[in-house]
Structures are given as structure tokens and as C-alpha cells.
Amino acid sequence: MGTMKVGVIAAEMEGRATGVGRYLEGLLEGLELWEHGIEWHLFFQGDPPLSLDFQGGPIHAHYSRHHGSRVLWEQVLITRELEAVEPDVVFGPAYTLPFGLRAPSVVTIHDISFEVLPEEFGLRERWRRRILARRAARVAQRVLAVSEHMAGLLRAQFGLAPGRVAVVPHGIDTKQFSP
């Protein structure tokens, strides 16, 4: 068996990192410590993030430089870019997966605030999140939850079988926080 290729939708790391961007940075930094033989292909919508060094090693950055709609890029345009790399699996760390993917996929759904606190979201954003997260949960081979509680909510809200949801708790950034 050759090297496994993982395509990662990494746009949340661009610019000022969001919570999901910081989650992905921490995950990749933690995985760098392992000798795992995985080739990581990170896909960015626009410009490179400043936070990680992508020179050589098992991490390869791909920049689409599409400065239009994030939803259009992450749902449609990225599919062709991902398939050019022929990944063994695609990882969506931010609730969604692109339409038309042929590769197996994994998605992290951090919360379902758009379902349980709908009044906190505008109508358009609430429906965008509902539709895309539900679809991603339906098509992914595995859905990652950040706690047992969230895994239970995902199974109940989206009708997921227990075996399709895995719990991967958030870690801690020991550079910023220490006992």
C-alpha cells in the first residue's frame, strides 16, 4: 500500500483564523508529531495563511485564488481541485462537504447551534447551515463530534447511526495555556 492522501478543506485557516481555523491548525500540528505516512493536501480558497509553514514535508498547499463566494467555492469549485489530487479521503473540518465528491469523506460538526438556537442566526445563514450540515452528515462516511454530548445530539437531530459518529475531543494549545 502506498502513501495515503488526505484532502483537507482548509479555507477556515485563511486570514484571521476562525475557531474552526484554530481547530484545524492544532489538529495538523498535533499530527505532525506522528510518523504516519500520510500526505496532507490542504485546499485554500484565497491567499496562504501565515500561521503554518508548508515548505516540503507531508503537507502540500493548494491555492485556488477564487475571491468570490465562499459557498460557491466550498460546495462546487473545490470538487475539481480535490479530484485532481485523487485523495483517498476528504476531510471537511467546518460542517460541510462539497457536492459531487467521489472520494470517501469525513466531516466535523462542532455544534448544532443553528438548530437549537435558530434565533441567533439570520434566516439565510440559518438555512444555509442547516442544509449544508445535514447534507454533509448524510453523505460523509464518518461524522466527527467534539464530545459525547454533541455525538448524541447529532445522532438525534440528523438521524445518524451510532457507528457513523466518532468523538474526537478538542485538545489544548500548550503554547498558550499551561498549568
Task: Please identify what each model-predicted range represents.
Residues 1-179:
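Carbohydrate transferase catalytic cores enriched for Leloir-type hexosyltransferases
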